[in-house]
């Protein structure tokens, strides 16, 4: 009888410990850090990785990774980012683009992401891409682009097309970034669609 009683107590103790351990199964789960999801940002040790990061920032809807694609004057004060908009965008948003800088880039991107349809993603597609110039400290990248923006703003377009010319420069520490950006309309692409410059202007107002 004593043996049976001891076994009963032992089994009860094991059962009680199992219940205590099981309580952790129902504990609130720590939310996953959003920065750990998506394609992420690769150290831009070459000009082509800058382009890869630019596309990934769109796919991930990640404004900070987008900004990391540009030159940083905190690292190299001689590399002030410059943006030249397409002709129609400059006519429409002349005062805005007169003093365009990295802060404007961030604000426009954040505004765009905040107005996306729920659970949707931006898409940047590049075509006819090439490096026109490749030097030890700079490169010039030319490409046509199309951008898909599934926005909830009915007054804004959802598709943009054009051509861009990017000067990608070494910013220090073996890293590269976009120092100059010239946007333009591509006459060979659907002229009814607006350029990237228009997109930036729309989401800055």
Q: Where are the predicted features?
A:
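Extracytoplasmic/secreted proteins, especially bacterial periplasmic and envelope-associated proteins
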Residues: 46-49, 53, 65, 100, ...
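Short, well-ordered alpha-helical segments enriched in acidic and aromatic residues
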Residues: 62-86
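Short, low-complexity N-terminal intrinsically disordered segments enriched in polar/charged residues
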Residues: 23-60, 68
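Short beta-strand edge/turn micro-motifs at domain boundaries
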Residues: 24-37, 138-140, 146-205
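Sec-exported extracytoplasmic/periplasmic mature domains
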Residues: 59, 71-75, 110-118
């Amino acid at each position: 009888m004593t043996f049976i009683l001891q076994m009963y107590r032992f089994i009860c103790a094991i059962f009680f410990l199992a219940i205590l351990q099981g309580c952790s199964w129902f504990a609130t789960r720590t939310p996953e850090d959003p920065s750990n999801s998506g394609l992420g940002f690769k150290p831009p040790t070459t000009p082509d990785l800058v382009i890869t990061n630019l596309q990934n920032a769109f796919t991930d809807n990640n404004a900070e990774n987008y900004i990391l694609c540009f030159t940083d004057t905190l690292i190299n004060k001689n590399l002030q980012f410059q943006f030249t908009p397409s002709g129609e965008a400059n006519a429409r948003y002349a005062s805005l683009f007169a003093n365009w800088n990295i802060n404007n880039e961030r604000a426009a991107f954040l505004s765009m992401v905040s107005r996306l349809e729920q659970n949707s993603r931006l898409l940047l597609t590049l075509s006819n891409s090439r490096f026109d110039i490749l030097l030890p400290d700079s490169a010039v990248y030319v490409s046509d682009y199309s951008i898909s923006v599934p926005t909830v703003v009915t007054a804004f377009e959802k598709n943009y097309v054009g051509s861009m010319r990017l000067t990608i420069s070494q910013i220090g520490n073996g890293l590269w970034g976009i120092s100059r950006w010239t946007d333009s309309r591509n006459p060979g692409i659907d002229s009814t669609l607006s350029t990237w410059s228009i997109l930036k202007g729309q989401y800055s107002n």
